[in-house]
Curated annotation (Swiss-Prot):
Gene3D superfamilies: Phosphoglycerate mutase-like (3.40.50.1240). SUPFAM superfamilies: Phosphoglycerate mutase-like. The record marks 182 as: Transition state stabilizer. InterPro entries: His_Pase_superF_clade-1, His_PPase_superfam, PG/BPGM_mutase_AS, Phosphogly_mut1. This is 2,3-bisphosphoglycerate-dependent phosphoglycerate mutase. It comes from Staphylococcus epidermidis (strain ATCC 35984 / DSM 28319 / BCRC 17069 / CCUG 31568 / BM 3577 / RP62A). PANTHER family: PHOSPHOGLYCERATE MUTASE. The keyword Repeat does not apply. One of its GO terms (molecular function) is phosphoglycerate mutase activity.
C-alpha cells in the first residue's frame, strides 16, 4: 500500500521571531531541531520504512529531512531536492515582523495576504530579486520562472506538476515517500490530494515537525490519514 508522509519543517529561527520567511534561508531553532528529531523517532517507533524523500532547497527543510532520517536510522535513502517544494514566496513581506506589518498595513490587509487563496503580497524589490538570481542554489532554474511573490494558488501551480511528474510516480510503484517541506507547499499538496475547497485550505493549520501520514489506494486516493 502506498504511503505518503508529509512533514512541515521544525520551528525556524524566524518562526520564533514572528517574521515572514518565505524564500529567506534560515536555520531551525533549538525547538525546531528537537521537533525534527522527535519526528524521526516517531517514524522509527512506528517501524515505517521510507523508500525515498523529497525536500526543498531551503535550509530549514533540508535540516529537518536530515534529522528525520537520522532519527529513523534511514540516512542512506535517496533524497531529491527541488525549488518547487519551497515555501510560498512572501515577496516584500519577507524579513518583516508580522505585528509590525499589521501596524503598517492594517490587520485586514495582512490577513488577506496571509490567508486568501489567490491574493499576492507586495512584490519583492529588484535588489532582493537580484540576490536570489545570483544565489548558486537557483542557478539551474530558468529565471523567468522565479517569482517576485506568490499567493497560495501560485504555490499550488508549481507544486502539483512536481507531484505529478516525480512524487506520485514512486507512490504508484507502491513506495513509502517522505516529503519534508513548508507550511504552504504542504498545504498545496493537501488541497490537491483531498480535493479541498479554496475556503477550507486557507484555514488549514499544519503543525511544525509533526509527521502526517497518508495511506493511499493503488490509484492514490486517500484511504486514511493521521499524525504520528
Amino acid at each position: 500500500m502506498p504511503k505518503l508522509i508529509l512533514c512541515r519543517h521544525g520551528q525556524s529561527e524566524w518562526n520564533a521571531k514572528n517574521l515572514f520567511t518565505g524564500w529567506a534561508d534560515v536555520k531551525l531553532s533549538k525547538q525546531g531541531i528537537e521537533e525534527a528529531q522527535s519526528a524521526g523517532k516517531k517514524i522509527y517507533g512506528n517501524q515505517i520504512e521510507i523508500d525515498i524523500a523529497f525536500t526543498s532547497l531551503l535550509t530549514r527543510a533540508l535540516e529537518t529531512t536530515q534529522y528525520i532520517l537520522a532519527g529513523s536510522d534511514q540516512q542512506w535513502i535517496p533524497v531529491y531536492k527541488s525549488w518547487r517544494l519551497n515555501e510560498r514566496h512572501y515577496g516584500g513581506l519577507q524579513g518583516l515582523n508580522k505585528d509590525d506589518a499589521r501596524k503598517k498595513w492594517g490587520e485586514d490587509q495582512v490577513h488577506q495576504w496571509r490567508r486568501s487563496y489567490d491574493v499576492r503580497p507586495p512584490r519583492e524589490s529588484e535588489e532582493q530579486r537580484e540576490a536570489y538570481l545570483k544565489n548558486r542554489r537557483y542557478q539551474h532554474i530558468d529565471h523567468r520562472m522565479m517569482p517576485y511573490c506568490e499567493s497560495l494558488k501560485d504555490t499550488l501551480e508549481r507544486v502539483v506538476p512536481f507531484w505529478t511528474d516525480h512524487i506520485s510516480q514512486h507512490l504508484l510503484d507502491d513506495k513509502t515517500v517522505l516529503v519534508s517541506a513548508h507550511g504552504n507547499s504542504i498545504r498545496a499538496l493537501i488541497k490537491y490530494l483531498e480535493g479541498l475547497s479554496e475556503e477550507d485550505i486557507v484555514g488549514y493549520e499544519i503543525k511544525t515537525g509533526a509527521p502526517l501520514v497518508y495511506e493511499l489506494t493503488d490509484d492514490l486516493v486517500v484511504k486514511d490519514k493521521y499524525y504520528l
